[in-house]
């Protein structure tokens, strides 16, 4: 009987999918479940002074990861591109927008070099 209950719980447990967004999905509408995660992967090059700035409603998402991973490159090479990974976990059901801008923080009032917008529907 215990094995049956364990198996039934295992079959009905929630599955958290990870939805990956890149620059290619700019202006896309993403439909996700409440238990899913969003992972945004963007190329960046910190040596240029540019950085991705993210805007999202903090009552709708929590930031669960924000890392920069160097792309493979020859040893000793500097100024090589990296991948920034931002992972968000939904906090509530609804429709919202995530915006990103690639800019230099000291260049106030200047438009970002690149801008991305994702619409997200959380069910």
UniProtKB/Swiss-Prot annotation:
Lineage summary: Eukaryota, Amoebozoa, Evosea, Archamoebae, Mastigamoebida
Q: Where in the cell is it found?
A: Cytoplasmic vesicle; Lysosome; Cytoplasmic vesicle, Phagosome
- From the UniProt record, report the name of the gene that encodes this protein: ICP2
**In which residues does the motif DE loop occur?**
71-81
Q: Name one GO cellular component term.
A: phagocytic vesicle
Question: What is the protein's name according to its record?
Answer: Amoebiasin-2
Tell me where the signal peptide lies. 1-16
The UniProt function text for this chain reads:
Cysteine protease inhibitor. Inhibits cysteine proteases CP1, CP2 and to a lesser extent CP5.
Instruction: Write down the Gene3D superfamilies for this protein, in alphabetical order.
Output: 2.60.40.2020
